[in-house]
Regions:
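Secretory targeting and sorting signals
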Residues: 2-26, 97
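Catalytic cores of phosphodiester-bond hydrolases, prominently lipid phosphodiesterases
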Residues: 27-382
């Protein structure tokens, strides 16, 4: 075998081992540790906690919107538990929707259940103080885990059992009062003001040790804003980042992110990375959900500039029902480091007589980034 062919074979073997879910979890000191954490691509799930309403609840849900089968067309999907997504499905990104509940019990008697005379929800965690995980309060509320702290403990337990994993990216959407439910007597969601945001940071820190997190303070360089740090100096290497968890704010620029960055324009002392506008002091993470059309090149430019980007490969359930995979192809080729889907496993779309699934080319839980892949990192399936 020639030296060139031998070198290529070794590079492919290294990448294959690195990409396999089991080996990715075990490999903490492999030859690719000098890669930076933005030089890879992983699959994440959208609404990672979501479980579907019962048939009576769906009927009550759709009656609110005039009787059209809205739920079955948009929300009829369920995810495995968070540990199963991370383990069996090889997911490395999660999304959780958050509702503040400092006293406990605020969301325990949803509007739909009141209309059905079904009684309040019975799980004790609904009545405990602490942030809750809900898609839409009153209207779509079943979850694999109810309290944020409980969900995060599941993630931490998996992480500690698989210490060599690439960084887990956890997207948090901070929810507010739903206008439809609110108009019908639904719950009033407390504001995400400075105090609530401080409680969010504290709740995350109550589960994860400082050494288990990647925060803006870990990325920002002395004398530079967070944005200039990632653009000029780059992200941490995988050697530093493996086995750790990173939290990203889903909400775009607005009142909530303004409250989170108040007095901390580069997120000093904060846990979350905000979804910001490129060029702003806090801009390290950017969300671009639609990867098709002109957005494809925009995402590639952002990735090349040094930003961490999240995009989506599908919209439930239109993508599955249509059979159109252009969004999936665009998302995977965009270079966005986090590609989110509702169908990360073979068989999840079979109920719709489809075989739609989103996976990295060649399989595995992680691959070299297709847009900013460094020379030593060669994928068999670019």
């Amino acid at each position: 075998m020639s030296r060139r062919r031998l070198g290529s074979a070794v590079a492919l073997a290294v990448l294959a081992a690195w990409s396999m879910p089991g080996l990715a979890s075990a490999d903490g000191r492999g030859p690719l540790q000098s890669l930076r954490m933005n030089e890879i691509q992983v699959i994440g799930t959208h609404n990672s906690y979501h479980r579907e309403l019962s048939k009576p609840e769906r009927a009550a849900h759709d009656a609110i919107y005039g009787g059209a089968p809205i739920y079955d067309n948009l929300l009829a999907y369920s995810h495995a538990s968070l540990p199963n997504q991370l383990g069996r499905q090889g997911v490395r990104g999660l999304e959780l929707d958050l509702y503040p509940d400092p006293a406990g019990g605020r969301y325990a008697n949803p509007l739909l259940r009141r209309r059905l005379a079904a009684g309040p929800l019975t799980a004790p965690e609904w009545y405990s103080p602490g942030i809750k995980i809900i898609h839409t309060a009153d209207l779509d509320y079943h979850s694999t885990c109810v309290r944020l702290a409980s969900c995060l403990r599941l993630v931490r337990r998996w992480s500690r059992a698989n210490r060599g994993h690439v960084p887990l990216l956890i997207l948090l959407e901070l929810k507010e009062t739903d206008p439809v439910a609110g108009a019908l007597g639904g719950v009033s969601v407390p504001p995400w003001d400075g105090a609530a945001l401080d409680r969010l940071d504290a709740e995350i820190r109550s589960v994860f040790r400082r050494s288990e997190l990647i925060t803006p303070d870990d990325v920002r360089r002395p004398g530079l804003t967070l944005q200039r740090s990632v653009v000029r100096r780059g992200w941490p290497t995988l050697r530093r980042a493996r086995g750790r968890v990173m939290f990203l704010m889903d909400n775009g620029p607005g009142a909530i992110s303004a409250a989170y960055t108040a007095g901390r324009p580069s997120l000093h002392g904060r846990v979350l990375f905000t979804n910001s506008r490129p060029g702003r002091p806090d801009a390290a993470f950017v969300k671009r959900n639609e990867p098709r059309g002109a957005n494809l090149n925009q995402i590639r430019r952002l990735v090349r500039a040094g930003y961490l980007v999240r995009t989506r490969s599908d919209e439930p359930l239109a993508t599955v029902l249509s059979g159109d995979t252009t969004q999936r192809r665009a998302a995977l080729s965009s270079g966005a480091q986090l590609v989110s889907t509702d169908f990360p496993e073979v068989g999840m779309s079979a109920r719709y007589d489809r075989d739609y699934v989103v996976a990295l080319p060649g399989g595995g839980s992680v691959r070299c980034n297709p847009v900013i892949r460094p020379r030593p990192c060669r994928s068999r399936h670019p």
